[in-house]
Regions:
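N-terminal glycine-rich anion-binding loop in soluble enzyme alpha/beta folds
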Residues: 5-71
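N-terminal glycine-rich phosphate/adenylate-binding segment common to multiple enzyme folds
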Residues: 69-101, 105-108
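Short glycine-aspartate micro-motif
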Residues: 5-7, 85-87, 267
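Glycine/charged-rich beta-loop-alpha catalytic/anionic-binding loops adjacent to active sites
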Residues: 55, 83-87, 111-122, 264
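Short coil/turn segments at secondary-structure boundaries
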Residues: 58-65, 89-96, 125-126
Length: 290
């Protein structure tokens, strides 16, 4: 009889209660900020980390989970009698974590040549609850008797149409990290310019620029409507960093889409380290990209 584990990392942003409910195994990233090493989901809450970023002098950096750490986790599954592990790490193009997992498979063969653990390593091509939610869906389907091959196909099919729109209310973090120039950030702040950014297939793109904080939410919702027009089984989620604009985004989405979000969730340390601590995100079903 199959015994299946679902393994991911803290970039998934799955709330702890959901992870426990569905039995999702989450490995934590380390985040270095002003010479202090934080273990995501362990050292502090998301809200505390947002505050630390706002007060920091430097830029947070994340360390990839190592092959040794993955090999130890795989060995644990072998010892506990698992037959399969579905491993979905952070987007391959944004971290060496995926390749480290590949290396760990080779290490496992050397350390446990007799093992029969099947490792299904998947690249979600995205971040946060864009894939985290569907890992929970996967876990529920497996519990109800679905085949591994079926849930993997369904997961990959879903990832092929998921998109994110980001609305950062401050350019400070993007300036610090070099994602925009210091001059552009200063001018943007002085003029109240806010970029509207999509994150699709692991790639970011500035889709629009609006002037004034009050224009951010309408622009995000309008862009989502345009990109999801005609999509069957449309759903959406809202990510946030505990800022007042979260409620504005949810209200606007409920009005525009005629339905509540699947989930309103906090952006974790890995994601907010890149977006900044004053950001809202709209995750939604777009058209298949093939």
């Amino acid at each position: 009889m199959s015994k299946i584990a679902i393994l991911t990392d803290s970039s998934c942003d799955i709330p702890q209660e959901m992870a426990e409910k569905y039995g999702i195994d989450i490995m934590s990233f380390h985040i270095l900020l002003d010479d202090v090493d934080y273990v995501e989901r362990e050292s502090c809450t998301n809200t505390e980390f947002y505050d630390k970023m706002r007060a920091a002098k430097g830029v947070p950096s994340t360390a990839a989970i190592t092959p040794i750490q993955f090999c130890e986790k795989y060995c644990q599954y072998v010892d506990e009698g698992y037959t399969d592990v579905i491993h979905v790490p952070i987007n391959k193009s944004g971290s060496s974590t995926y390749n480290n997992a590949l290396m760990a498979q080779g290490m496992l063969r050397e350390e446990r040549p007799e093992h029969h653990l099947k490792i299904h390593l998947l690249d979600p091509h995205t971040y946060s609850m864009v894939f985290g939610w569907y890992l929970c869906v996967m876990a529920r389907k497996l519990k109800n008797g679905a085949e591994i091959s079926h849930v993997i196909r369904e997961f990959e099919k879903q990832m092929d149409c998921m998109e994110i729109v980001l609305g950062p209310y401050s350019l400070k973090q993007m300036k610090k990290s070099g994602r925009i120039s210091a001059a552009a950030a200063v001018m943007g702040e002085l003029m109240g310019i806010r970029p509207i950014i999509t994150l699709i297939d692991g790639k970011t793109k500035v889709e629009a620029k609006v002037r004034g904080d009050d224009k951010v939410v309408p622009a995000m919702v309008e862009l989502c409507k345009q990109r999801s027009e005609g999509v069957e089984n449309f759903d959406y989620m809202i990510g946030h960093t505990n800022i007042p604009q979260t409620a504005d985004l949810e209200k606007a989405c409920r009005k525009a889409f005629g339905k509540p979000p699947l989930l309103v969730f906090e952006l974790g340390g890995v994601v907010s380290a890149n977006t900044g601590p004053d950001t809202v995100a709209l995750v939604y079903t777009g058209h298949p990209r093939g």
